[in-house]
From Swiss-Prot:
Gene that this sequence comes from: PSC
Protein name: Acidic endochitinase Pun g 14, amyloplastic
Location, primary (coarse class): plastid
Oligomeric and partner information: Monomer.
Keyword annotations of the record: Allergen, Amyloplast, Calcium, Carbohydrate metabolism, Chitin degradation, Disulfide bond, Glycosidase, Hydrolase, Metal-binding, Plastid, Polysaccharide degradation, Transit peptide
Expression across tissues: Highly expressed in seeds and to a lesser extent in the skin of the pomegranate fruit (at protein level). Not expressed in leaves or flesh of the fruit (at protein level).
Source organism of the structure: Punica granatum (Pomegranate)
GO MF assignments: calcium ion binding; chitinase activity; endochitinase activity
Lineage: Eukaryota, Viridiplantae, Streptophyta, Embryophyta, Tracheophyta
Cysteines paired by S-S bonds: 46-93, 76-83, 185-216
GO biological process: one example: seedling development
């Protein structure tokens, strides 16, 4: 006859299993910041306590050996040197154990890489102006950001793998360079496939929005497409963690918005079973008035 555990020990064991299960499935929230002056400061974004990653966006012009251009919309003007005060805010965020990344690309801009030498040259610029290198004209001041985010939606599709390798090669045990990417949900992504295949990316936050014809996002109560696309991405992508990228409000994207109750009740319980699940990415801070607060405990 099998022995039974005393009630107190059985209860303790059950609680331990529950806590471990919750720890395994717990995810983070990443947010894009920088494209609307009405979204509040970088420091106030981090002060909310809702985000583990804040992605400063964007470097909108680069490649072909041109001088890169940083666009932070209504916040400040990097070209005029009025963004250097962000360094204190970046350090404040990092002091709260929040990773701050610089995003390159975006949905509007003028960028392409034309050769391996061009990619290496741009990697040097990113290293010297945002990461651990040195430059007399760092757009955001002397703070050292945690890494680079690839949000490549325009231009040529080549040499981003070279860029990823060049940036990754600068990582050390003392100072890691985090690499993240935001591919579109149609698989494989036309711009980032080669880069993602390097296996060098720590987080990949897939944009499950603005692709209404691709059958890879949520629409009108249908969760099948987004869940199928999630499974395709997680089974074929080598990355530290994979995030579900969503608009933070209906106005934040042309399509793909998921009501919070649908996300927490029908989608998150399914995708959190994946070992690669990392959490949710939201676009953007300006639109995130209530969404992250509503879903945070379930992410």
């Amino acid at each position: 006859m099998a022995k039974t555990l005393p009630f107190s020990r059985a209860l303790l064991l059950s609680l331990s299993i529950l806590l471990v299960a919750r720890a395994i499935s717990a995810g983070d929230i990443a947010i894009y910041w920088g494209q609307n002056g009405g979204e509040g400061t970088l420091a106030s974004t981090c002060d909310t306590g809702r985000y583990a990653y804040v992605i400063v966006s964007f470097v909108t012009t680069f490649g072909n050996f041109r001088a890169p251009v940083v666009n932070l919309a209504g916040h400040c003007d990097p070209a005029a040197g009025t963004c250097t005060g962000l360094s204190d805010e970046i350090r404040s965020c990092q002091g709260k154990d929040i990773k701050v990344l610089m995003s390159i690309g975006g949905g509007a801009g003028d960028y392409s890489l034309v050769s391996e030498a061009d990619a290496d040259n741009f990697a040097d610029y990113l290293w010297n102006n945002f990461l651990g290198g040195q430059s007399s004209s760092r757009p955001l001041g002397d703070a050292v950001l945690d890494g680079i985010d690839f949000d490549i939606e325009l231009g040529t599709t080549t040499f981003y793998d070279t860029l990823a390798r060049a940036l990754s090669s600068r990582s050390t045990q003392a100072a890691k360079v985090y690499l993240t990417a935001a591919p579109q949900c149609p698989h494989p992504d036309s711009h980032l496939d080669a880069a993602l295949n390097t296996g060098l990316f720590d987080n990949v936050w897939i944009q499950f929005y603005n692709n209404p014809l691709a059958q890879c996002q949520y629409s009108s109560g249908n969760t099948n497409d987004i869940l199928s696309s999630w499974n395709t991405w997680t089974s074929s992508t080598t990355a530290g963690k994979i995030f579900l990228g969503l608009p933070a409000a209906p106005e934040a994207a042309g399509s793909g918005y998921i009501p919070p109750d649908v996300l927490t009740g029908q989608i998150l319980p399914q995708i959190k079973t994946s070992a690669k699940y990392g959490g949710v990415m939201l676009y953007s801070k300006f639109y995130d008035t209530t969404y992250s607060t509503t879903i945070k405990d379930q992410v």
